[in-house]
């Protein structure tokens, strides 16, 4: 009997609240709780929207165009901009609602935007603009007896990637990773001027620079060895090193010293991205070698951008957690609607 009475009282209470909601101003405490719930939902949306980047696998292949890489960086730019806009909206809403944590949240958001988001946006835009609408394939190898090409705006690629890497991968990876040994025997060092059978021949100007079928296979094997010996972070660090061997190779310059695996892999990744960039081809028919060169090129760019994507995500997540702490909400909880918080009357037959 007592349970029935409790249920009736609860039902009457809910009816009363429902009736008052139409003509009486919302209770300040209820309004604040609803505001917190809304903030939680907004915050979850920030995490979800940024997670869309990671969910899109970089399925690069021999059919992938350089413009697709540019589109990847444009996606990074747009998504981070969206994250920035949503965070600013949260701060605006908190101020409007008189949330006591608005000031602390505004400070945390400003720090995240100034030190991280704006720099990633800037770097991604620089890279995307440098690649533009380049329709040539990423694994672009010159035809038999044809010359390779450095492509254009490699300096802007380096600048843009550096702007991002300095934020999300500072101190991670090494531009000098790997060794300078040729794949042919694992003991003989490469040469600064790129001798026959060395991966450096891929960047050499001149028709058929990769050599005859036999040497072209060695070149391909050395390139594959270099890419396989280093991490994505190593490749990225090699790409952005000031006056580094990777950038020199990518622009068809003499590295000045026997290039290590990291420099070779970084140079390959830059040549892959550069508008008009093309690897030197063989001087004779060497289909197997060309296929292997393309494979090394795809592997290098995939390694680099996979690592970059994950690093961006981790960096943003860490920044968002700082904002969450300032907001005094648990971003790990699934936000719920006000209706889900409303107690329901129960009956006991």
Curated annotation (Swiss-Prot):
Q: Which InterPro entries match?
A: Borrelia_lipo
- What's the superkingdom here? Bacteria
> Nucleotide-binding: present as a keyword of the record?
no
GO CC aspect terms: cell outer membrane
Q: How does it sit in the membrane?
A: Lipid-anchor
S-diacylglycerol cysteine lipidation sites on this chain? 19
Indicate where a lipid (N-palmitoyl cysteine) is covalently linked. 19
Q: Where in the cell is it found?
A: Cell outer membrane
Query: Which UniProt keywords are present, listed alphabetically?
Result: Cell outer membrane, Lipoprotein, Membrane, Palmitate, Plasmid, Signal
- Broad class of where this protein is predominantly found: membrane
Respond yes or no to whether keyword Lipid metabolism is given for this record: no
According to the record, the signal peptide region is 1-18
Q: What does this protein do?
A: The Vlp and Vsp proteins are antigenically distinct proteins, only one vlp or vsp gene is transcriptionally active at any one time. Switching between these genes is a mechanism of host immune response evasion.
Q: What does the record's miscellaneous section state?
A: Genes for both Vlp and Vsp families are on (usually) unnamed linear plasmids in B.hermsii HS1.
Q: Which family does it belong to?
A: Belongs to the variable large protein (Vlp) family. Gamma subfamily.
Q: What is the protein named?
A: Variable large protein 19
Question: Taxonomic lineage per UniProt?
Answer: Bacteria, Pseudomonadati, Spirochaetota, Spirochaetia, Spirochaetales
Task: Provide the gene name from the record.
Answer: vlp19
